[in-house]
Amino acid sequence: MNTNDAIKILKENGLKYTDKRKDMLDIFVEEDKYINAKYIQQVMDENYPGISFDTIYRNLHLFKDLGIIENTELDGEMKFRIACTNHHHHHFICEKCGDTKVIDYCPIDQIKLSLPGVNIHKHKLEVYGVCESCQD
């Protein structure tokens, strides 16, 4: 997803475009990995001195509810990234830098076979480790 796609989603849901929202979205697009709210606040503070965590978190939750960003817990902290594809997939997440790699394989079909009679409504699979760059 790019910034324009995200802005389109905001507008389709009756939400207004603001420079702050665009700048937050730009951070996600540029980073393309899991980042925490503190990092977003630090980057945003350069153009919006004194921007509050409330503003950051309010927009993070809005973006998440609209499917613009994804979230995960890494090292006991909530982190966020831009939604990367429209197809079903999972992620490998580097525990050191937060970089992600798409895993196109999904084990849910095999799991469904071992759970006859149940309806699975949703699932999430994340694989954690250390990426090639961080192993050096």
UniProtKB/Swiss-Prot annotation:
GO terms for biological process: negative regulation of DNA-templated transcription; regulation of secondary metabolite biosynthetic process. GO terms for molecular function: DNA-binding transcription factor activity; transcription cis-regulatory region binding; zinc ion binding. It is found in: Cytoplasm. Zn(2+) binds at residues 94, 97. Fe cation binds at residues 88, 90, 109, 123. Residues 1-85 are annotated as: DNA-binding. Keywords: Cytoplasm, DNA-binding, Iron, Metal-binding, Repressor, Transcription, Transcription regulation, Zinc. Acts as a global negative controlling element, employing Fe(2+) as a cofactor to bind the operator of the repressed genes. Homodimer. Belongs to the Fur family. This is Ferric uptake regulation protein. It comes from Staphylococcus aureus (strain NCTC 8325 / PS 47). The gene is fur.
